[in-house]
Amino acid sequence: CEIPFETLDDLSGKMPNLRQQMMRLMSGEIKGDQDMILLLSKKNAEERLDVFIYNLSRRFAQRGFSPREFRLTMTRGDIGNYLGLTVETISR
């Protein structure tokens, strides 16, 4: 579902709780982007993969699923592209 910005802006002006929730969500997205930039620029391959798996585990737990056992639906190539690593590095 897509809501035009103007409509969302008008609604959030009339509903302070909506504005607060939007700010919280946007803040979380910005923080996630900053964390990814740090991950890609400062961490070695093993640390990148560790953080990736940890974050997946945390997200599964937040949604009520097992944080210890889950299926990775991404291919090794997809994970490598996401983390800036080669498929060979991911396979090790």
UniProtKB/Swiss-Prot annotation:
It comes from Capnocytophaga ochracea (strain ATCC 27872 / DSM 7271 / CCUG 9716 / JCM 12966 / NCTC 12371 / SS31 / VPI 2845). It is involved in the activation of genes necessary for anaerobic respiration. It probably also activates genes involved in the production of virulence factors. This is Anaerobic regulatory protein. Its cofactor is [4Fe-4S] cluster. Binds 1 [4Fe-4S] cluster per subunit. Gene3D superfamilies: Jelly Rolls. [4Fe-4S] cluster binds at residue 1. Induction: By anaerobiosis. Keywords: 4Fe-4S, Activator, Cytoplasm, DNA-binding, Iron, Iron-sulfur, Metal-binding, Transcription, Transcription regulation, Virulence. Pfam families: Crp. Homodimer.
